[in-house]
A protein has these predicted regions:
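Glycine-centered coil/turn sites that cap beta-strands in beta-rich domains
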Residues: 1-39, 65
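Terminal processing/anchoring signals of secreted or surface-associated proteins
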Residues: 8-11, 45, 65, 80, ...
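Residue-level detector of conserved, well-ordered beta-strand and adjacent loop positions
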Residues: 9, 30, 52, 66-68, ...
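Residue-level signal for short segments within beta-strands and strand-turn junctions
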Residues: 10, 40-44, 69, 86, ...
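Short, conserved beta-strand segments of beta-strand-rich sandwich/propeller modules, principally
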Residues: 26, 76-81
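Short, glycine-anchored, charge-dense loop/turn motifs used at functional sites
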Residues: 36-48, 80-82
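Glycine-centered tight-turn motifs at strand-turn-strand junctions
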Residues: 47-75, 86-89
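C-terminal tail/sorting-segment detector
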Residues: 79-99
Length: 99
């Protein structure tokens, strides 16, 4: 079952140097089903962004996120909740960002 294998890496995501914010400011959702949506929320329930993962090869895959919200703002330190969903199933988990 794909729901047991979805992960966010790195988790927690920690920015340790100023140059990382420019060049490497992203996390990866791995082991995704080929067609899914990733909804990201703050712990307070505010919608941060929705990512659409589409891999027409049918393989499990990876989707990167640059840590920028749907309002084009950098996200802040905190705990975030994500929901990966397909037409048939979903998984909910969390990840941390430390700046």
């Amino acid at each position: 079952n794909w729901t047991e294998n979805v992960r966010v890496v790195p988790n927690p995501y920690k920015v340790s140097a100023a140059w990382e914010q420019t060049y490497f400011n992203k996390i990866a959702f791995i082991n995704l089903p080929s067609m899914c949506d990733i909804h990201i929320f703050t712990l307070g329930g505010d919608h941060v962004i929705t990512l659409e993962h589409r891999d027409y090869t049918g393989e499990n895959g990876t989707e990167f996120w640059d840590l920028v919200s749907r309002n084009d703002q950098d996200v802040v330190t905190g705990l975030y909740v994500y929901r990966v969903e397909t037409e048939d199933d979903f998984v909910i988990d969390k990840f941390a960002i430390i700046k």
